[in-house]
Amino acid sequence: MPLFLFIGHDHPPNSMALRDAVRAEHREYVLQHDDAIRSAGAMVDAHGHQCGTVIAFDMASVDEVWAWVRREPFFRHGVYARTEVVEWTLALNRFELRDWPDPRTLTQG
């Protein structure tokens, strides 16, 4: 199956407020629909502030990726100023596996 990268560039300069407002809904969606995600994370600027998203998908077509993205809360709530999906060929993989905490098991303090 082909690999695709979704790249979403946030609206500068104050996207963090919107990201924070939608983050719980975003994480819930990703956790419920993550079977095709191979890697994901936030892009950060030179100051360490989140400024976008990159998600690597293992899906049959670019149309399937866009269908997933269009239902994703950051996309639906307008976090991104610009988005793209590109087919990607993995040539080297040295990522260390990191688990993403399930927000349903986190306590708020």
What do the PLM-derived regions correspond to, one by one?
Residues 1-109:
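Conserved, structured core segments of small domains
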